[in-house]
C-alpha cells in the first residue's frame, strides 16, 4: 500500500490461493487499502489486451453518487478484485473472521455480478464493523435483515462500488475536518429507526439549525443521489431509492448507518 505520511502500514498475509488473498491490516487502514488494491489491480489489468475492455458504462445506472468528473469511463478491466472487510478487535479468532470475510466477499461479488448486466466490470466492497463475536448469531445476511431493515427501509447501503467507497470515506474525512459532533450523527442515525418521513423531517430540521449544515449537505445528499430509476419516487434527504427485483415495491437505503 502507498505510504501514508512517510510510513508503511504493517500487514500479515494469512493465505494467497487462486484469485483470493486473505490479509490482516490495521483497522483504520482496512477500507483505504481494500480500495487501493482494487483500483491498482484494475489499472494494471486494463492495460493488458487479454483483460482490457474497450467499452464504458452509464455512470448514473451503476453508482449512487454524483460523477466526480465530466468524462464517462471508456476503458475497463474485464477482471475486478472485489473485497470483504471485517473491522474487529485484535483478539477476535481468525477462523471466525475468515467465515465473516467469506460471507462479505460473496455479497460483494453478488453485487458485482448484477452490475455486469449494466456494463460495469469494476470491483465492489462489502464490510462489517464487528463489536463482539456475539453480534452475529447466525450469518451476516440474517443480521442485516433483522437489525438493519425496517419494512421497506434499509439502514445500510452496503455493498459499495469502489468509487462509492471512496466517496463514503470522503464523507468521514469532511465531517472530521468540520469537527462535526458525533452526538448529532448518532441522533440522526436514531431517527432512521422511526421511519422514512420522521427521519427526513428530523434531517431537514437538523440542517436548518446547525451551523455546519452546508458541509453535511455537500458530503451527503449533494453527493449520494442514488442510481437512475425508470419510474417511481426519487431519492430525498438521506434516503436513496434501492434497486430490487420488484420495481413496484419501492425500497430505500441510506449511507448514514455505515458512517
Please give the residue ranges for each predicted region:
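Charged, helix-rich terminal subdomains or tails
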Residues: 1-259
Amino acid at each position: 500500500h502507498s505510504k501514508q505520511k512517510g510510513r508503511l502500514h504493517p500487514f500479515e498475509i494469512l493465505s494467497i490461493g487462486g484469485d483470493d488473498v486473505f490479509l490482516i491490516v490495521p483497522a483504520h487502514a482496512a477500507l483505504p487499502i481494500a480500495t487501493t488494491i482494487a483500483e491498482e489491480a484494475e489499472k494494471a489489468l486494463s492495460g493488458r489486451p487479454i483483460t482490457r475492455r474497450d467499452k464504458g458504462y452509464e455512470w448514473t445506472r451503476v453508482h449512487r453518487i454524483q460523477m466526480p468528473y465530466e468524462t464517462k469511463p471508456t476503458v475497463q478491466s474485464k477482471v475486478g478484485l472485489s473485497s470483504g472487510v471485517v473491522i474487529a478487535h485484535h483478539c477476535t479468532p481468525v477462523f471466525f473472521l475468515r467465515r465473516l470475510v467469506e460471507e462479505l466477499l460473496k455479497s460483494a461479488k453478488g453485487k458485482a455480478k448484477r452490475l455486469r448486466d449494466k456494463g460495469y466490470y469494476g470491483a465492489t466492497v462489502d464490510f462489517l464493523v464487528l463489536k463482539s463475536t456475539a453480534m452475529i448469531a447466525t450469518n451476516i445476511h440474517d443480521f442485516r435483515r433483522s437489525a438493519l431493515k425496517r419494512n421497506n427501509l434499509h439502514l445500510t447501503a452496503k455493498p459499495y462500488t469502489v468509487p462509492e467507497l471512496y466517496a463514503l470515506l470522503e464523507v468521514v474525512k469532511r465531517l472530521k475536518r468540520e469537527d462535526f459532533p458525533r452526538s448529532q450523527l448518532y441522533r440522526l442515525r436514531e431517527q432512521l429507526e422511526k421511519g422514512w418521513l420522521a427521519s427526513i423531517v428530523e434531517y431537514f430540521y437538523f440542517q436548518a439549525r446547525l451551523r455546519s449544515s452546508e458541509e453535511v449537505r455537500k458530503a451527503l445528499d449533494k453527493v449520494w443521489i442514488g442510481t437512475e430509476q425508470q419510474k417511481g419516487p426519487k431519492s430525498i434527504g438521506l434516503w436513496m431509492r434501492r434497486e430490487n427485483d420488484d420495481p413496484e415495491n419501492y425500497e430505500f437505503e441510506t449511507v448514514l448507518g455505515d458512517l
